[in-house]
C-alpha cells in the first residue's frame, strides 16, 4: 500500500490561526495531501492522507517547526486517499468541548496511561473506563466494560457527567478516545470538577491497537474513524462484531448517513436493507421530499411508495 493516513494533534500556542491556516493549506495542496485540519490559538488537530513520500514530507515539515517538534503522528497504511478534499480551518477550539471556563491540557490534564497500564486498568474492578466519544462511535466498537455516555456530540459530555455523577464518585476514572485529543481536555475538566484519580489512554485507541504488548486486547468491534474508511480494526488477537443492524438487529459494521438531508443520522445498515428502506433511518425520513437515495437511484414515485410499505414490518424504534 503506497498511501498512508496520518492522525495527529498538538496543544501549543499559534498566535495567528487565520494566517497559519491559509499558509498551511497551500503547503498541503502543493504536496498532494487531502484531509481536515483544525487550527486555533490552542494548537492543531489534523488527519490527512497522501502517498508515503508526501506524508513523509509533511511530517518532516511539521517537525522542523519548534512548536510541533515533538508531535506524535499515528500512521495507518491505506490503499488510496481517505479524503476527497483538503481543508485547513481556523477555529476557536481544536476540539469542541464548549466550556464556560476552558481547560488548558498543558496545565491541567489526567494522568497518562500507557497501553499496558490501560490494559491493567481494564482488568481492575475498582476502575471505571469511560468512553469520551459519541454514541455512534461506541456502538460500532468499544473497550469491554466501558461506560457509554448517551451523547451525539462531544460538547454534551460535561452535562452527561454531571447528571451521572453517582456512577463515578469515589472510583478511579480512566477515559479514552480515538487519538487522545478529546481526553487531554476532558480529563482535565474532570480534575477541575473535583474527581480524583483521573487518567487517560495516552495516544488513544489508535495507539493501543498497534502496541506490540497489548495488541488491541479487550477491544470489541471496530474503531470509527472520521474519513472515507469509516472504520478500522483494533484487536489483533480476536475479532468480534458488536454493531447491530438498525432494522433487524443482526451483526453489522456498515455505517451510512440517513438519506434525509435534514436528518443525516448515522445508522448501521446492510446493503439489502439500505435498498429496502430507501437509505433512511425511519418512515418519516424515507418519505422526505429530498430523499438522497431516491434521487441518486432515480426511483419512480410508484416504486418509492412501494418501498415505503416495507416500514409496516419494521420494529417501533425505526418509525421515529
UniProtKB/Swiss-Prot annotation:
Which cysteines does the record link by disulfide bonds?
none
What PROSITE patterns does its record include? RHODANESE_3
Domain Rhodanese, by residue range, is 123-217
The protein's annotated catalytic reaction(s) are: uridine(34) in tRNA + AH2 + O2 = 5-hydroxyuridine(34) in tRNA + A + H2O
Question: Where does the record locate the signal sequence feature?
Answer: none
- Class in the EC hierarchy, top level: oxidoreductase
Database matches in Gene3D superfamilies = 3.30.70.100, Rhodanese-like domain
Q: Which GO terms describe its biological process?
A: tRNA modification
Alphabetically sorted, this entry's keywords are: Oxidoreductase, tRNA processing
Name the residues annotated as catalytic in the UniProt entry.
Answer: 177
Task: Report the EC number(s), separated by commas if there are several.
Answer: 1.14.-.-
Among the GO molecular function terms of this UniProt record, one is: oxidoreductase activity, acting on paired donors, with incorporation or reduction of molecular oxygen
What family does the entry list? Belongs to the TrhO family.
User: Sorted alphabetically, which PANTHER family does this protein's record hold?
Assistant: RHODANESE-LIKE DOMAIN-CONTAINING PROTEIN 7-RELATED, THIOSULFATE SULFURTRANSFERASE/RHODANESE-LIKE DOMAIN-CONTAINING PROTEIN 2
Explain the purpose of this protein: Catalyzes oxygen-dependent 5-hydroxyuridine (ho5U) modification at position 34 in tRNAs.
* Name of this protein: tRNA uridine(34) hydroxylase
Native species: Staphylococcus haemolyticus (strain JCSC1435)
